[in-house]
Amino acid sequence: MMRSLLVLVLFAMPNAHAEDLHFLVPGGAGGGWDSTARGTGMVLRNAGLIESASFENISGAGGGKAIGMLIETASHQQKTLMVNSTPIVVRSVTKLFPFSFRDLTPIARVIGDYQVLAVRSDSEIKGFDDVLARFRENPRSVKVAGGSVRGDLDHLVPALALRAAGEDPRRLAYVPYDAGGKALAGFLTGEGDVLSTSLSEAMEYRRAGRLRIIVVSAPARVPTAADVPTY
């Protein structure tokens, strides 16, 4: 399963060139949405396409609060872009919030990223088979941390992996955080046994020796983590 990060607007902006651009981030600071918004703003400034970029983080309802605000204040948001990703479709289809992804207009896909499951470098868990063994003995003994609400990709990916192994995904002990950065910080200080996150967010900490990636949700092994099995 791949996470696609999108830049969305409610409707097309009146001019191709905007002096000021405002980015609405539907999650906390330090997560994938936040870093994507800030990186996109920096690139647009450096390319001379905009004069300045501002950023606003609005957390809540798995991104639903920010989406609702953008839709309800559309007349005042002509220079606003919102960064979101594949879960916006999931949450809309499952009616986790009253708005539809069809109320927004995707204008660019900027990132495609795989999901991973990771453990701390000193963990006794060596692979997904160990996770399964612990889960089968006691589902509550394996807590999975993720930077999004229940029903989002960080929750769905380990749940689907458990279901594929013949287990009941509803028994998964999932610990949600406001953003990927907060999930990583909490996980590295000992909160949770397994981290569900994106490959790009995990790689920095893998290189630093602070965590080990045990599986990646790719159809084949990825070059940047060729030793990691897929699922």
Regions found by a protein language model. Give the residues of each.
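C-terminal lobe and pocket-closing loops
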Residues: 201-231
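A structural signal for short loop-to-beta-strand junctions that line the ligand-binding cleft
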Residues: 79-81, 98-117, 143-146
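Short loop->beta-strand "edge-of-pocket" segments that line small-molecule binding or catalytic clefts
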Residues: 21-27, 31, 132-151, 212
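Short, surface-exposed alpha-helical segments at coil->helix boundaries
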Residues: 34-38, 42, 155, 159, ...
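A bilobed periplasmic-binding-protein/Venus flytrap-type ligand-binding module shared by bacterial periplasmic
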Residues: 24-28, 114-124
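Sec-dependent N-terminal signal peptides
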Residues: 4-13
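N-terminal (or domain-start) structured segment
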Residues: 17-103, 150, 167-194
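Flexible hinge/capping segments at coil-to-helix
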Residues: 119-140, 228
